[in-house]
């Protein structure tokens, strides 16, 4: 079998907005402030930009985890911009996040209100992986290479 270097054809051009990735996930939640607190305090992400409305309500935040960004937006009523909590549906995607300690992050997420869907277990490809639903309805596969 031929060894493949998956990064041979990766575009090396910098993004026009410094600090952004070429592909960024954008999610919608009812309370951006609570979501930012959960992602930064529990999951050890960093909020690098926040935008408030005139009343001081947080509407938007750009969050970073080990060089990858995602955006947290305020869900809007009567709009297609809804959170899984609004729709009572399973999200159509799952975040796959690598960490240094799956068991610790799983426990910390559960203690902060996430629901464990699958306890940490070894996968055939060599990851220890757990699946959780965060308090905002999004699913996370938390993994570490073992």
Regions found by a protein language model. Give the residues of each.
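C-terminal catalytic core of tyrosine-transesterase DNA break-rejoin enzymes
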Residues: 136
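Vicinal oxygen chelate
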Residues: 2-26, 37, 43-100, 106-133, ...
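Short acidic-aromatic low-complexity motifs
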Residues: 29-33
């Amino acid at each position: 079998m031929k060894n493949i270097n998956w990064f041979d054809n990766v575009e090396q051009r910098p993004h026009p907005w410094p600090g952004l990735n070429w592909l960024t996930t954008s999610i919608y939640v009812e309370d951006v402030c609570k979501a930012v607190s959960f992602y930064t305090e529990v999951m050890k992400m960093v909020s690098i930009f926040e935008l408030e409305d005139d009343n001081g309500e947080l509407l938007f935040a750009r969050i970073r985890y080990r060089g990858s960004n995602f955006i947290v937006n305020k869900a809007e009523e009567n709009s297609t911009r809804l959170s899984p909590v609004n729709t009572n549906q399973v999200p159509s995607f799952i975040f796959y996040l690598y960490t240094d300690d799956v068991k610790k992050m799983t426990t910390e997420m559960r203690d902060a209100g996430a629901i464990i869907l699958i306890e940490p277990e070894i996968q055939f490809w060599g990851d220890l992986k757990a699946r959780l639903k965060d308090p905002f309805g999004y699913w996370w596969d938390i993994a570490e290479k073992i």
